């Protein structure tokens, strides 16, 4: 019993263990199917129905062998262990580096209690245990707890025998493993984007501050006042089958369109009420230029590609924040009254859904939010993004097409018309993220789906005219344009000080905003301080002409 008390006290050092501790303290072991066997060295082996889940004779050696297969150096890592059954794996992993942490996902309270009653460990302060939690709660915790910059540190190890002791456990751990892998891929994609785009975001923010004035998106807060419904249009291939229906709905619905879906609308003489663009300057910029001609409001960020916005009337641009790069400085507080924060979350569709909710419509109607492929296409035929489908179709036999994983990933997903369609790991990951957000919004605003070829979203029903009794023309009026609360001068002064002082000291906060990749390489001693300064000075020289405009 002393072991258990000591172990619980150690686990209490981490606030994220409190739920697990409460479950352990309440649980009483009765008629256990698990048992403990001691070897000659007083090391334990866990048995299930008298069958060992780990080595009876050499659990430490087994642990070393398994961990060393997954870890080739002793740098700090975050280990995710599916089942506590072989605690020696976890303990050995933690012993390799004092800064490593372990997250244990365990379905059975019984086995966890049995182990904590019998083991001794000096590493429990660095353990988080998620005990008999719902799968969606595990994924939500992972999303919240693991920072993007830490995603490279993760190793994930499933205890094969413990996760297959019965059908229920197998289903549980298989689902957790699948969803975690998708979430890790999503965060790796985001990290890669951050490494690549951060210098561009930083430059764009400075350019937009200098040349592209606008208002806060708070100008549009609650503008629909639960009276006018909203149609959110993404660029999935399904919308090509619904052009006439979208034309009809545009008379009574506020049309909010993603930038890469905008071309589909203007090519079919449909004028949206607003366009959302958060892109770094690729195919969507052409569509934004068309939006300028059409006099359509643009919801965007200071980190977005700046050229198409130049010389637009200030009353056409409405900014929100991703809280990325220099946005963390120019906005005094991401939660302040005038600055609206919608996280990037890997895809423009996520902040667009948040904006839809922010406008407070009668209901939200989705179109083209497919998360799957229709006739080997992932995008509308009018979208410039359709080029990705061509590259991915194997009509081009080049190394380049290996970079695109939206097609031919051998994943299937069920759609509203009950047909299984091809998808990909990345699209399924985005769909799950989108579904989680949608189900939070549904508590306040109903969400429907127009396009039956789209992947099914939990609790989002297919739309029909019975859902809608919209007879009045939409009438959207802006009475008060709200200025952004931006610390422009303070930011410029801090940037100038950072550049001038870089020979003496490196402000880690600024350095990480300009180039997290180079800063990471510097911290890991993969590049010298001189090489890092050369990169920063090169970046600064490229934006000097913009800084002179302030």
Model-derived regions: residue spans:
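Acidic, Ser/Thr-rich peripheral helices and adjacent loops at domain boundaries
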Residues: 121-129, 276-282, 289-294, 380-402, ...
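Short, polar loop motifs at secondary-structure junctions
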Residues: 86, 107-109, 259-263, 300-307, ...
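SAM cofactor-binding core of SAM-dependent methyltransferases
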Residues: 78-132
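Acidic/Gly/His-enriched mid-domain segments of enzyme catalytic cores or analogous surface patches
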Residues: 112-197, 266-361, 515-550
């Amino acid at each position: 019993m002393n072991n258990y008390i000591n172990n619980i006290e150690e686990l209490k050092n981490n606030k994220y263990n409190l739920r697990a501790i409460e479950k352990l303290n309440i649980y009483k072991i009765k008629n256990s199917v698990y048992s403990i066997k001691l070897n000659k060295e007083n090391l334990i082996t866990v048995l299930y129905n008298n069958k060992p889940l780990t080595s009876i004779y050499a659990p430490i050696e087994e642990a070393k062998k398994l961990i060393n297969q997954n870890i080739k150096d002793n740098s700090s890592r975050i280990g995710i262990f599916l089942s506590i059954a072989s605690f020696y794996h976890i303990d050995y992993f933690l012993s390799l580096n004092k800064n490593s942490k372990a997250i244990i996902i365990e379905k059975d309270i019984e086995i966890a209690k049995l182990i904590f009653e019998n083991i001794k460990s000096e590493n429990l302060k660095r353990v988080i245990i998620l005990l008999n939690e719902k799968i969606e709660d595990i994924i939500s915790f992972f999303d919240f707890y693991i920072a993007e910059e830490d995603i490279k540190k993760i190793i994930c190890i499933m205890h094969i025998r413990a996760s297959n002791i019965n059908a229920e456990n197998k289903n549980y751990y298989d689902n957790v493993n699948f969803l975690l892998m998708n979430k890790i891929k999503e965060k790796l994609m985001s990290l890669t984007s951050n490494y690549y785009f951060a210098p561009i975001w930083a430059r764009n923010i400075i350019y937009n501050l200098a040349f592209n004035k606008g208002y806060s998106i708070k100008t549009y807060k609650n503008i629909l006042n639960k009276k006018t419904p909203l149609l959110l249009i993404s660029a999935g291939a399904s919308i090509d089958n619904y052009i006439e229906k979208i034309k009809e709905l545009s008379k009574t619905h506020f049309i909010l369109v993603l930038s890469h879906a905008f071309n589909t609308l203007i090519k079919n003489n449909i004028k949206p009420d607003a366009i959302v663009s958060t892109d770094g300057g690729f195919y969507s910029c052409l569509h934004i230029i068309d939006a300028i001609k059409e006099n359509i409001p643009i919801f965007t960020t200071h980190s977005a590609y700046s050229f198409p916005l130049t010389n637009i009337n200030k009353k056409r641009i409405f900014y929100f924040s991703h809280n990325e790069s220099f946005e963390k400085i120019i906005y005094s507080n991401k939660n302040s009254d005038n600055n609206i924060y919608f996280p990037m979350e890997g895809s423009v569709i996520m902040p667009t859904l948040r904006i839809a909710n922010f406008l407070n419509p009668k209901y939200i109607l989705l179109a083209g939010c497919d998360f799957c492929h229709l006739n080997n296409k992932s995008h509308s035929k009018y979208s410039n993004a359709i080029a990705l489908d061509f590259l991915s179709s194997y009509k081009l036999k080049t190394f380049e097409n290996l970079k695109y994983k939206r097609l031919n990933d051998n994943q299937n997903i069920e759609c509203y018309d009950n047909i299984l369609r091809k998808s990909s790991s990345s699209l399924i990951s985005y769909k799950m993220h989108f579904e989680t957000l949608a189900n939070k919004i549904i508590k306040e605003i109903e969400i429907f789906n127009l396009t039956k070829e789209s992947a099914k979203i939990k609790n989002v029903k297919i739309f029909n005219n019975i859902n809608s009794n919209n007879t009045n023309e939409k009438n959207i009026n802006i009475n008060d344009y709200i200025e952004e609360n931006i610390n422009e001068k303070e930011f410029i002064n801090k940037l100038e000080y950072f550049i001038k002082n870089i020979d003496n000291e490196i402000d880690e906060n600024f350095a990480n905003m300009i180039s997290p990749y180079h800063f990471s390489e510097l911290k890991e001693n993969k590049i010298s301080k001189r090489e890092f300064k050369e990169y920063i000075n090169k970046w600064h020289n490229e934006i000097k002409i913009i800084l002179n405009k302030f």
